Each structure stands twice: as structure tokens, then as C-alpha cells.
Amino acid sequence: MSQEKYIMAIDQGTTSSRAIIFNQKGEKVSSSQKEFPQIFPHAGWVEHNANQIWNSVQSVIAGAFIESSIKPSQIEAIGITNQRETTVVWDKKTGVPIYNAIVWQSRQTAPIAEQLKQDGHTKMIHEKTGLVIDAYFSATKIRWILDHVPGAQERAEKGELLFGTIDTWLVWKLTDGAVHVTDYSNAARTMLYNIKDLTWDDEILELLNIPKDMLPEVKSNSEIYGKTAAFHFYGGEVPISGMAGDQQAALFGQLAFEPGMVKNTYGTGSFIIMNTGDEMQLSSNNLLTTIGYGINGKVHYALEGSIFIAGSAIQWLRDGLKMIETSPESEQFALASTSDDEVYVVPAFTGLGAPYWDSNARGSVFGLTRGTSKEDFVKATLQSIAYQVRDVIDTMQVDSGIDIQQLRVDGGAAMNNMLMQFQADILGIDIARAKNLETTALGAAFLAGLAVGYWEDMDALKELNATGQLFKASMNESRKEKLYKGWKRAVKATQVFTQEEDADDDAK
């Protein structure tokens, strides 16, 4: 009797690593999770030790096997999904990183990004990479490491150093240095990759003086990249055959295969991605153009809007203001509110993301009266998440010319029914919550499984992650627009407040 086969997804996130084993029905059979330390050398800097990331991945692979009694030989293929943009540079011979991994949120390279803007490169970089110039992306992080580690530039030019985002680093480690690759979705977040020509861009590399020899080969999101070295996978030589950045993996896990399909992951922040098909559409409204996924010789482009504060606004109510004891409690408080929704919280704690990209804005509250209760405040904070999502969805409709009919949702805060209902109401469209909320890991598993024939084709996947619950809009049009206009006024006032503060500082 042949043993049952499975797919393993490695989900390497910002604060923890997970390994999840899925069966042929797309069900989670086993999982293991391990946190690793965050390093904050200075205010605004965020780094990771790349070896600690690797150790945590080794640990969770073992944990998933131990929990399930599944053997490495029963794993048909491995899919990898990862925190995007985070940058590792290591020695090609020894495999030792020459500096900590610089994490996507880290602002230490902001002066390099600022200089690129001042030198007038915004348009060129946007047209080639689909991105805005920002410290968020890998390009400035590589430049910073080459500038700050003695001798690094010279070693890079001699071909002694390799660069990779976390997907590349993990494949390199799992294959014991045999394979140096990345995938379309991760390459598209480096600010070095021409997403139209599908090549590393020589003009941008020259501008930043980054040697091309450092860069990994770019492959599709679903193909066999290499096999695990037996001693790194507990005796198994298993194909690594699926790879995607976390938000693109969630798009795939949500089965958003058609142009116009949109998913939103309500995590710490909120990441909204729309499949725009084989057309690369540059945003005129500060959304990012990126690659959703490339499979079977075809690339699917996407528009992306990032909201910095979503689930973390609920954590703020819990940890900062002590208004609630647990995050799920926010739903009961919001339902107990008797206000007429006249309170607005603008959670711009670290600035405003898409479509505003206002890094100076700070949080504010409007519409308070003597009658405002804790319940009203909690409700307004939850509603702020939904309002921000509408800001992005409205912008996507303008940029793409596509009428969005449904939003597919996942992530922790998607479990809040009150928030999902209000999201449906304020957008005026259906919200489809996935039955399996592990969409990021599932997306990586699907990509890996397709490459080795574990699942026959993309149609076979459509049965595997059906909608768990559908929330339909029930608010009347005039109320919906009145509430949203109030939100737009609150955002405007927030921005004016900071601008005036900046003007006061300049006058001193």
C-alpha cells in the first residue's frame, strides 16, 4: 500500500516562521510555528539575523513532522512564501551573511531613496518597476549594505557576494548552496526588476552601482527550482517547486485567477491586491503595480494598495488604551455602541499608506461629545479599517477601469463579523470570507503542487478553498455616502493638522 503524499508550505513571516503540511483536499494536516528575535539598532531601523531565520525554519520543518508522524519521504513538494523586500547579502563561498537582513519596514535607507527622488528618477523607476521610490523596497537596502560593510562593494564586483530576498536565502540554504533563484513576485519588489521586460534592469543597477552578478536568476512561481539537500530536510530529497511573496501567495490561495478579482488580507496592516491580467497597468493614483504570479508561461499583473494600520489598531485599543482585554472583544463592544457613527478615528500612527502616502500624518479622532462611550470609540476604530479599504478599492476601480463586484478576504481581523458586515456596507459589494483562512501558506502549497502534478491544474483548485461566509451590503446609498464623506473630511483635517505643524517648525 502506497503512503499518502502531502505538500509542505514554509511561510516565513516578519515575526515568525511556520511550516504547514496540506493534504490533497487543501486541508491543514499539521503545522508548527516559531518566533525569532527582532533587532532594533536605532529608532526606525528593523533588522533580522538571517541565520536565526534559517534556524527557525529548520525547527518548524521538524515540528510539523513530529506533530503529524508524517515522514519527509511523504512530502511530494515544498512551497515557500515569505515576507517581501527583506534583504540578505551573503558570502558565496562560506554562506555567511555579511550584515543582518534589513527588514521591509526599516527606514534606515530612507536618505538613499530621498536622493533618488531629488535626482529626478521617480518617473523612470515607476515606469520600469511599477513602484514608487521608497526605502520599503530592496534596492536601497542592498546599496546601504554595500556602503556600510567595509570592502563589500569590491567583493560584490569580484562576484564573491550574493543577494537574495528571504525566498532566495531559504532555497539557497535548503539546497546547500546549489541554487540561487527568486520568483517573479519577489523580484518585482526589489525596485531593480523591469516587470515589463521581465529582466533585471541595467539602467537602475548602474544608477545604484549594484553588480548584476549578485542577483539571483528569476523564475516563474510554479516550477521545480531544485531539491532539498537530504541533510537539510531530515533525510528527504524533495523538490522545491512553488514560491511567492506573502501577499501574492494569498492572492493565489484565494483563487483570484481572473482579472478584476481582488483579495484583502487583514493582518497587522492590510494588503489589497487586484489581478489585472496580462496587462501591466501603471497607477496614476499612488497604487503599486506589481506581478501577481507567473505560471504556465504567462505573467499575471496586479495592482496593490498597502494600508499600514489595520489589525494593529485593535492591538492599540487592547495594549495602548486598555479599552479591551482581547482583540475578539472589540466586536462585542462595537455591537453594543448606540452612536450614530459620528465618531471617526484616523489611525495614522506611522503615516498614511495608499492612496495618500503621507508619511508625516499622525493619528487623530473627530466627532467626540460628552455622550461618546468606550463602545463608540471601539466601533469607530474598527470602522477606520473598513474606510481605509474603501479608499484603496475606489482608487483601484479608477486605475483599472474594472467594476469590482466582490472582495475576497482573509487574515486575523477577517474573523470579526461586525467589521466584515460594515466593510460590505461601506463598499456596497459582497465580501467573501475564505473557508480556509490560511490562504498565504495555501497559495504556496498550490503553486508547489501544480508544478509536480499533485493537483492537475488550476481548475482542480477551485473546489479546495470555497467561500466560508458571504457578507452582503445592506446599508442604503445615502447613509453609506454620508458616512464615507465624513471619513474623507477626517483624513483631510488630519493632514492639514500635520502640515500646519510642519509649517510652524519651518518658521522657527
Curated annotation (Swiss-Prot):
Annotated pathway: Polyol metabolism; glycerol degradation via glycerol kinase pathway; sn-glycerol 3-phosphate from glycerol: step 1/1
Organism from which the protein derives: Streptococcus pyogenes serotype M1
Keyword ATP-binding: yes
E.C. number(s) listed in UniProt: 2.7.1.30
Listed name of the protein: Glycerol kinase
Family indicated by similarity: Belongs to the FGGY kinase family.
Binding site for ATP: 14-16, 268, 311, 315, 412
Catalytic activity: glycerol + ATP = sn-glycerol 3-phosphate + ADP + H(+)
Keyword list, A-Z: ATP-binding, Glycerol metabolism, Kinase, Nucleotide-binding, Phosphoprotein, Transferase
HAMAP family attached to this UniProt entry: Glycerol_kin (MF_00186)
Record-level GO cellular component terms: cytosol
Residue ranges of coiled coil: none
Residue sites binding glycerol per the record: 84-85, 136, 246-247
UniProt-annotated binding residues for ADP: 14, 18, 268, 311, 412, 416
SUPFAM superfamilies for the chain: Actin-like ATPase domain
Binding site for sn-glycerol 3-phosphate: 14, 84-85, 136, 246
SUBUNIT field: Homotetramer and homodimer (in equilibrium).
Zinc-finger recorded as keyword: no
